[in-house]
Amino acid sequence: MAVVVVQEGESFEKALKRFKKICEKEGIITEMKRREFYEKPSVKRKRKQRAARKRLIKALKKKGLL
């Protein structure tokens, strides 16, 4: 859980920026967006397969094999 203790004399904008940075680092926003709507297991499986295929193609292009 993201917790930001505001230092004495610290501006609100600076504290908010630190909070956003912590949330990004912990993946809270990404997780929230992923859980916003129910995803059927078949759709989840297809999404993961697509991502794996995309990573494979990217790796092959980087090696110059594709």
From Swiss-Prot:
Gene: rpsU
Source superkingdom: Bacteria
GO CC term, one of those recorded: ribonucleoprotein complex
Name of the protein in question: Small ribosomal subunit protein bS21
Keyword Ribosomal protein (UniProt): yes
Family (UniProt): Belongs to the bacterial ribosomal protein bS21 family.
A Pfam family per the record: Ribosomal_S21
GO biological process: translation
Molecular function terms from GO: structural constituent of ribosome
Keyword list, A-Z: Ribonucleoprotein, Ribosomal protein
